Amino acid sequence: MGRTSAFDRDDVIRAARDVFWARGYAETGVAELEEATGLKRSSIYHAFGSKKGLFEAVVARYLDEVVRSRIGRLQQPDAGPEALELYIAEMRAAIASGTPRAQAGCLLLNAACAPVVDDDPDVRALVTAYTDELRAAIAAGVDSARPEISAASRAALSEVCASLVIAALAVARVDPDAADRSLGAVHTAVASWVSA
């Protein structure tokens, strides 16, 4: 009979998430993960296979708890024209809050800016899947907000909105004011569509 884990997997993932979020994937050492999780290296590797395996578990949880809880509403069949406006307003409020998580920026886009992404196709694939999912959600929001315009015009507006949101999330860590300006531009545009 195999040994059962003497730790709570959810607690370990949350603790590791905080370290990866604050330090980034490339800059996080296993010793830091040991300290944050209370586990030894061997337990981390046994439970997750590797540092990358733990990061993948963190990303899955981050997507479910942080990202999809926000963008999922944009993709609901009954999403109204105001859904995208509300999403952008929430993003602005989160960045303006000044909380440690807001100041840390986006976990996945921070990873995208690290040199490891160039060398690690698995991490690159995680980041690409995230930005694709974000783009699809924003496209659904634009579709709800502007059903009267052509599909090509909605696609172009979606890409502009998504690019500004991704830019804002990418710079939130180092320049929250620039992030707010990018999101503010999107919010103003989207609010004008909804009120038109």
Where do the PLM segments sit?
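N-terminal intrinsically disordered/low-complexity leader segments
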Residues: M1-F7, R146-I149, A196
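Short, structured helix-loop boundary elements
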Residues: R9-D10, V30, K52, E56, ...
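Helix-turn-helix
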Residues: D11, A15, V19-V58
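Solvent-exposed, amphipathic alpha-helical segments
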Residues: A15, V19-A22, S69, R73, ...
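Hydrophobic alpha-helical connector segments
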Residues: A57, I71-A104, E148-A151, L157-S158
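Short, basic, alpha-helical segments at the C-terminal edge of helix-turn-helix-like DNA-binding modules
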Residues: R61-V66
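Amphipathic alpha-helical segments used for helix-helix packing
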Residues: A83-L84, T99-A125
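Hydrophobic/aromatic-rich alpha-helical bundle segments in the mid-to-C-terminal region
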Residues: G98, D120-D132, S144-W193
